[in-house]
């Protein structure tokens, strides 16, 4: 094992044996890779995860196995604490890297010592590993270096497998609080509050969409909503040395809270959770009344107040061109 890896790749893993091999292969098949280590913390998997890890025995690979499941947040905290690299990247076992991921993110961080975090674009893949399209539109035209804090408060546009940061930037925010439903946005927002970011305008990772995605589960059960507003309440808590919000803290709060309530309303509407959708639409309208100028938003909000059945019938008729 390299005594001083430049990069640590940490993988919190639980019952993803069917995808883990693809993830590890993408790591060990990097081109022009710097000295690196891979830290896998297996959170008590009951599938073939141990057998998959044995197939990838390598001096660069360190494996920690829990005898019982301790939960995703505890596993992430442990994995980050074990990382020894100057830079750290975190990837879930169902995602994978493009061959130039390591060389590119390490180049950017080495060439820009003031930058705390680098992220690039990601492509969507299905459960078979077939690319299905881009995950989102690129947030910038070309490479970008600067503050992403306010933009990240409004929208989580950093795809976890397509990102990496300096060790100290990560560890300033470890441990992740127990009960937080996700940690990607937590790290992005809090690191962006202190450090400039660098956007690399290139596809450097693949994000897999499948039926067991963690994010879909937390969106449906409400834990995503609770975690979002826990973090926002913390960020906007008045502090003497706080971030200088412009034009004012209150204006930024209305914009940010409104954006998240609207996003949650649209998700709940898609899941058929009408009461939650209506509640979040109303909160979004209170924060940002202009969101009703979007005809689609207005129609969907109306459907939660009046009749979802009428909305579905109207949508079907319009879809047939009537």
Name these PLM-found stretches:
Residues 21, 47-55, 96, 100:
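Acidic helix N-cap motif at the loop->helix transition within catalytic regions
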Residues 139-228:
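Conserved nucleotide-sugar donor-binding catalytic segment
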Residues 72-75, 103-172:
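Flexible acidic/His/Gly-enriched loops in nucleotide-sugar-dependent glycosyltransferase catalytic domains
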Residues 25-35:
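Short, acidic, metal-binding catalytic loop of nucleotide-sugar glycosyltransferases
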Residues 26, 42-51, 68, 92:
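A conserved acidic beta->alpha catalytic loop
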Residues 66-83, 147:
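Glycine-rich, basic loop-to-helix element that forms the pyrophosphate-binding segment
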Residues 88:
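Short aromatic/hydrophobic "clamp" motif used to bind/position activated sugar donors
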Residues 157, 180-181, 186, 193, ...:
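C-terminal subregions of glycosyltransferases and related glycan-biosynthesis enzymes
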